[in-house]
Amino acid sequence: MILMTLFSSLSAPTAAKEREKAQKAAAQRAIQEAKSAGTSRAGSPAPKKKGGSVAKSGGGAAKSGAATPARGVSQQQLDLSGLNIGEKEEKPVDEPPPKAVFAREKLLEEARRAIEAEEARGKKAVSLVVIGHVDAGKSTLMGRLLYELGALDEKTRSANERGSSKVGKRSFAWAWNFDGTLEERERGITMDIATRAMATPHRQITILDAPGHKDFVPNMISGAAQADCALLVVDATTGEFESGFERGGQTREHLILVRSLGVTQVVVAVNKLDQVNWDRDRYDDICEQLKPFLVQTGFQPSKTSFVPVAAMQGINLANRDDEEAAPLKAWYDGPTLLDVLDQLDPPARDITAPLRIPIANVFKGSTSGTAVSGRICGGIVQVGDRVRVLPGDETAYVKTIETEDESLVWAASGSNVTLYLTNIDPINLNIGSVLCLPHEPIPLAASFSARIIVFDVQIPITTGTTVELFHHSRDVPATISKLVATLDRGTGKVLKEHPRVLTKSTSAEVCISLRATAMTGPNSVAKPIPIEPFSVNKDMGRILIRRGGETIAAGIVVQLL
């Protein structure tokens, strides 16, 4: 009996393996039968529609995109088939590179003419990041504004309203135009950057809707790094504005972040005024609290605007003549939010600079292979260009350029674009990498000197302080390796060399060194990142420094070491 028990225990794993092999074999048969079921009756694959979905063949009823499983196939077998066991891995196939339309000199001439024509027409392109404390109504405001402008159709609006009602979040219906993931809709908060296009009479605006929750500040930084201007949304209801503006609230931090990343224009939408009965004193009080902080942060009063709105009702967004706006019109006769956005000024673009495109996102295109998105921070790119990915030594060809759902032959500095690339394995494309022309590569550095401004820190910065360094969509561990000098904030003159500590509101020059992570091993060295001095490229020379979930400093790169 003991021998039988021992034999049984030894043979059990073998029997389990045999069952697993049988299940895998059955799963493979199920895959083959399912594929056979997905073809037309004549034996050839069914024709595909433009979007890649299977078209209806003949006069029969339309079928869903999923193949019907064969009879007798268990759920476990279907689950195993989803693992693609036994299938060969698809490898990217090199395609003939597309031909460039223009020689480089002709391309610059074409771009200059187009930009001049755009300015003469008065239709300038500008990117706008929407910021503010969590639950201030950012996504709701932008969703309602798009609807008012006709950029959100009635069918989509109704679908969002029905869907949000089903999950008990009907008040978030307008926000669903931006909050597209299941988790965002279930939690009722924005978690990642959402991008939409909006046309006003004189501007073509790319909207970057940023998350307001402090847990998603890194995503907010990624969006702010792609923006020309900012729209700050604040909640006027009692206690809510104070919660966002006091220490720990995201209103303050978001303003500091966007200014540190080069944004110089900000529009403040004082939202939810209908919930305080359109109280003018409340509106004035909020404006008076924000104005000195905006100046302190570096925003000039001439480039700052305030607009009272009620996003849910659509009051003073694009139309001031609604009957519901009567309580507001009793004391306010200024511009609508649309009027203010229509006057935003995009900064100057340097199309002659070397091409720099920090990758903000990598994804699989529906029809054109691998795609990357990001903002062009210098130069100009056209279809057919061969681009290099740094870090690394991989190259690719630009197959298609898209912006705001429009295909372009070329795109210039300042544009937020999606590039479809060929002749490159997607594994070599990473968020934070930079695309450039092969003969004008961006330098890589693991240490550099920087001029920083220290914010309202509780613990002073000392030599050896470990931090998180943010540069566009990349965040890496780093160390303040040396305190070079404290500086006069106005003149930049050296006040003290080799200080021991840096306290709040201090301007200083420091040396920063990247740190290797625990994942790379104990004896590994830090990997350099693509970065440039501020004097060479302003967009590529700005940095943010965070510690313990708070932004403690921001600055510009002085010299690569």
Specify the residue positions occupied by each region the protein language model found.
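C-terminal effector/interaction modules appended to NTPase cores
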Residues: 1-26, 33, 37-38, 43-53, ...
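Conserved catalytic network of the ASCE P-loop NTPase/AAA+ motor domain
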Residues: 121, 134, 190, 197-201, ...
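P-loop NTPase switch module centered on the Walker A-proximal segment
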Residues: 131-133, 139-218, 230-240
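Residue-level signature of catalytic and energy-coupling elements of molecular machines
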Residues: 135, 141, 160, 188, ...
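Active-site phosphate-binding and catalytic loops of NTP-dependent enzymes
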Residues: 170, 179-189, 243, 293-303, ...
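Inter-motif core of Ras-like GTPase G domains
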Residues: 203, 217-243, 251-264
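Conserved nucleotide-binding/hydrolysis micro-motifs of P-loop NTPases
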Residues: 213-214, 236-240, 272-277, 311-315, ...
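Canonical P-loop GTPase G-domain recognition
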Residues: 275-354
